[in-house]
């Protein structure tokens, strides 16, 4: 099966993603990893430990909008186009999402209702309550952990 893992960070960085991908590959699956690059000059396609890495450019400014993913849909719409391309180009049969901030982008891009696993590594809405930028005056106006909780 062609599994598309979705990570909204550069790769390789997170050992959990590598470990899960390796386990899936060892079980006979093809793993394609959607990830982002903040650099304009990057290797778009790569193979690392049998993981087919597909990098997409994301500006730092756009990435900062991921903090507003469930308040304003900018990040969702920009990333969903990239994810839609990834799904079609690689003929993905199952999606595996690693981060809540990109989940709405994946759901928006998944026009053919490919089976999807949402594998959250942390309880982001609870953690957000301790983030300095969420507790700032502007953060309290723009970022709602409650909206993330119901997402």
Q: Which role does the model predict for each range below?
A:
Residues 80-85, 124-125, 139-151:
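Membrane-proximal helix-turn-helix segments that form the acceptor-binding/catalytic region
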Residues 34, 56, 119-120:
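Generic beta-sheet signal
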Residues 16, 71-79, 146-150:
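Soluble or luminal CAZymes and related metallo-dependent hydrolases
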Residues 14, 40-42, 76, 94-113, ...:
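An aromatic- and histidine-rich active-site surface loop
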Residues 18-22, 84, 106-107, 151:
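Short amphipathic alpha-helical segments and helix-helix/interface helices
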Residues 1-41, 45-47, 51-52, 88-90:
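N-terminal subdomain of nucleotide-sugar transferases
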Residues 58-73:
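Phosphate/nucleotide-donor binding subsite
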Residues 48-54, 129-135:
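Short, flexible, mixed-charge acidic loops at enzyme active sites
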């Amino acid at each position: 099966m062609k599994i598309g893992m979705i990570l909204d960070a550069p790769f390789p960085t997170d050992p959990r993603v590598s470990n899960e991908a390796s386990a899936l590959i060892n079980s006979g699956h093809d793993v394609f990893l959607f990830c982002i690059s903040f650099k304009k000059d990057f290797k778009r396609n790569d193979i690392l430990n049998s993981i087919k890495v597909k990098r997409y450019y994301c500006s730092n400014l756009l990435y900062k909008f991921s903090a507003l993913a469930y308040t304003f849909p900018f990040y969702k719409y920009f990333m969903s186009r990239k994810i839609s391309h990834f799904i079609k180009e690689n003929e993905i049969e199952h999606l595996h999402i690693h981060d809540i901030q990109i989940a709405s982008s994946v759901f928006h891009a998944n026009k053919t209702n490919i089976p999807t696993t949402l594998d959250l590594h942390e309880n982001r809405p609870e953690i957000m309550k301790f983030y300095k930028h969420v507790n700032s005056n502007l953060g309290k106006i723009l970022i709602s952990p409650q909206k993330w909780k119901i997402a």
